[in-house]
Amino acid sequence: MITVNPDGKIMVRRCLVTLRPFRLFVLGIGFFTLCFLMTSLGGQFSARRLGDSPFTIRTEVMGGPESRGVLRKMSDLLELMVKRMDALARLENSSELHRAGGDLHFPADRMPPGAGLMERIQAIAQNVSDIAVKVDQILRHSLLLHSKVSEGRRDQCEAPSDPKFPDCSGKVEWMRARWTSDPCYAFFGVDGTECSFLIYLSEVEWFCPPLPWRNQTAAQRAPKPLPKVQAVFRSNLSHLLDLMGSGKESLIFMKKRTKRLTAQWALAAQRLAQKLGATQRDQKQILVHIGFLTEESGDVFSPRVLKGGPLGEMVQWADILTALYVLGHGLRVTVSLKELQSNLGVPPGRGSCPLTMPLPFDLIYTDYHGLQQMKRHMGLSFKKYRCRIRVIDTFGTEPAYNHEEYATLHGYRTNWGYWNLNPKQFMTMFPHTPDNSFMGFVSEELNETEKRLIKGGKASNMAVVYGKEASIWKLQGKEKFLGILNKYMEIHGTVYYESQRPPEVPAFVKNHGLLPQPEFQQLLRKAKLFIGFGFPYEGPAPLEAIANGCIFLQSRFSPPHSSLNHEFFRGKPTSREVFSQHPYAENFIGKPHVWTVDYNNSEEFEAAIKAIMRTQVDPYLPYEYTCEGMLERIHAYIQHQDFCRAPDPALPEAHAPQSPFVLAPNATHLEWARNTSLAPGAWPPAHALRAWLAVPGRACTDTCLDHGLICEPSFFPFLNSQDAFLKLQVPCDSTESEMNHLYPAFAQPGQECYLQKEPLLFSCAGSNTKYRRLCPCRDFRKGQVALCQGCL
């Protein structure tokens, strides 16, 4: 007699109720999929002999791409089934619970009906996904390495002794011991055999010579370069807004900014197009990877966008994206590590292997976070393609911190340096480090009508404080100078707060809270004064205030702030001394728009306030911070900067050609001789060079500025010879060539001349009282210090 458990009847009944016709149909699809999987793959797996490596898969395996596609589709279908059944199960459970009025429940040790079936389907989906990955790798290997070698020849694979490949045997030894340390090696077909090591090291990497029996079949032909397309200026930015993506407050801010400035970018493009005339511009394929916005870097900026956090980086990135797009180049934008890996062609694994394909981008714009991510995941390809990278670097990277060996030996410690890039690959927010390239950003440009309206609507006694975060207002001693300012002006703040007024803000300050950008601009257009507390350093807000007709008042730092005495700069790859909150505003704009005073000197501060109230200024914006100025600058960089070309060696005197200079008529400096041909390929053009001998203890950056010029590090190789010293009437009793970021230089006493041995260490920055540095300077376009007169 057969007995039936009542609980079993109930379970069967519930399953029959739960598995309605649609669900039975879905399960049928799943069963059919599994059957198709086994039948379709059976032949392919049978083609592989037991014990063979991926290199010995028979070439009769056909339909590799199709099989991969089928596997992917089946995996996706099963995942979709799981999601649909999960949703239906939740709906069924909720409806049953609703009908039962809360009486129906499951014991703690029993799963709901159908849960076991769901788990099985999920496990099947995971297995199919895993099989898809494995088969995908196997089929890739079979197609990539389809030239099968006989077993006898395979046993004869040995590391060749070739003087052109001195590291080959060592790399083979390393592969024997470590090939399982990263799955990427198996992805490229390494299976532990000697032949697989040699094939990988000769065809994927380049440490071993090509194997003779694979030359004709396995060697990949270099892809044909795509036909050149001419870049065309764009004025419609709707596609750019789509490229920028969404989902982060930072991206929303950037898109709003781009949209607001659309008309100004369009007008700037029209003006630059007229200026360039028929100049041919090749369209570049450009990847923009904003590393600091990735989850892997922490993305500390996005959550603070709506809370008064710093916006300078997002302002700059929005303008970089827009400028590149308006110039007509092909853009790809990534803000996640997964997107970066996909666009670069990173193989699966831990980043030890090169990319799976040639880099499809002519240029990559990123930041230090993105640079770290690329180095971690590109393997040897990072070294191969790093010349195409441009690093957006707010505070600059000096050559002494960039050269890893030199920085390590001489104590130039930093959290961000040691990259061994050409220093011009680092691109700054302001032109404070001529060793780097000045990228910048834009401020809104007013037309003449708007300027007149602003000038007529100014309140003569209204001041706005620079600082949206309450922490900025914790400055010690602020009550003293704010008290003086309060005697003459009504003080306004835009400090973020959630529920109650920040206690750091004095009661006499009228705090508007965090304002949207249009409202903040309206506040600036009414104000007479924009006053800084000393932080943040070198942001875009002071330029924006000056452009809206404000006078900017800032504190003078004594002693100057640097990585030696100030926590903010500690660890940054620069020794630059900052003498005020905004050195660019002080040095390149100055009075009457910018006043720099000692806030600790009450008399000086009060006198400045009185003078400012009597001073009338017009809205002012330097050309290099207009949309046209930024377009002009980036166009010149893309056209002329080529860091993939091998640099000219810094030859010692015995091998250096005679310098093509003549002493200027006033005998103070060297100039390029008129009857001398220009250096081919030099940019900036060599005729812009002016060479000065600095006084002891003076950096080349300051020496050139003293003469109304800009230091130009690309001219250093022309001066790196004893002949340059002789032309300046400096006798050299001895000449030595060494690695030192201060060379070429003349040492006193001793009459010794020192030449530079390492091209990456040519540096405008740096000084020592022992040396008189030989400094290459150049002229610059009015309002555009990044470009010389003949650079465009």
Swiss-Prot record:
Keyword Amino-acid biosynthesis annotated: no
Membrane-traversing stretches: 25-45
Keywords (A to Z) from UniProt: Disulfide bond, Glycoprotein, Glycosyltransferase, Golgi apparatus, Manganese, Membrane, Metal-binding, Signal-anchor, Transferase, Transmembrane, Transmembrane helix
GO cellular-component term (any): Golgi membrane
A Pfam family per the record: Glyco_transf_18
pH dependency: Optimum pH is 8.0.
Taxonomy, superkingdom: Eukaryota
Entry's localization field: Golgi apparatus membrane
Residues with glycosylation annotation: N127
Family, as annotated: Belongs to the glycosyltransferase 18 family.
Protein name: Alpha-1,6-mannosylglycoprotein 6-beta-N-acetylglucosaminyltransferase B
Organism the protein comes from: Homo sapiens
